């Protein structure tokens, strides 16, 4: 076996309440990582493809025993073996913000009402609590001809019951081994319910 690190967290064996100040400015840094929902696909050429939800974290209270996560974080991350190991330096890329430069975002929960943000009735609380990105819970499969399909659960901002915004399963595909990806399609519209069905944890036959 050969181990490859596709997101190299900037501090090895980080302990909660230690505080991350990577550039020693006196301000704790926010970091991007995964949301702990992911899947691995081995293609027909035995190449690994990884899909995972994106998430921001901040540990700025050094006495509470937990870190903060940000539920409005969006983006489905993608990596394959051709991209190589993560070599991102352990210093912030932007002011007090670190993120890996290796995985790429291939899909997101969409701005369906065109107000330049993805948010709804439950954006300040009351949302279904999965501790997940707005685009998360991926599942992937591949055809005999090498076409890759990926489903993910997407926050669907224009479908709500005035309390909760619902998630729907979206699907994307790549016809060129992961180089480019299609636009997402909602495959669980549930029109008969005005879309008000929570669609999560889809599973695709590999």
Which role fits each region the language model picked out?
Residues 1-206:
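Extracellular, repeat-based ectodomains that mediate carbohydrate processing or recognition
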């Amino acid at each position: 076996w050969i181990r490859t690190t596709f997101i190299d967290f900037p501090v090895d064996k980080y302990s909660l309440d230690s505080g991350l100040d990577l550039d020693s400015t006196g301000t704790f840094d926010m970091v991007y990582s995964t949301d702990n929902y992911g899947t691995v696909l081995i293609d027909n050429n035995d190449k690994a493809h990884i899909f995972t939800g994106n998430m921001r974290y901040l540990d700025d209270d050094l006495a509470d025993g937990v870190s903060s996560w940000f539920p409005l974080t969006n983006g489905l991350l993608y990596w394959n073996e051709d991209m190589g190991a993560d070599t991102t330096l352990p210093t912030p890329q932007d002011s007090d913000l670190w993120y890996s430069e290796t995985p790429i975002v291939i899909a997101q929960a969409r701005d369906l009402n065109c107000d330049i943000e993805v948010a709804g009735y439950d954006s300040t609380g009351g949302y279904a609590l999965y501790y997940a990105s707005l685009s998360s819970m991926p599942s992937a499969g591949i055809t005999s001809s090498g076409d890759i399909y990926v489903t993910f659960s997407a926050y669907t901002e224009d479908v709500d019951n005035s309390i909760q915004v619902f998630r729907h399963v979206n699907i994307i595909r790549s016809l060129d081994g992961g180089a480019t990806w299609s636009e997402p399609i909602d495959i669980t519209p549930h029109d008969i319910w005005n879309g008000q069905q929570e669609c999560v944890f889809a599973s695709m036959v590999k």
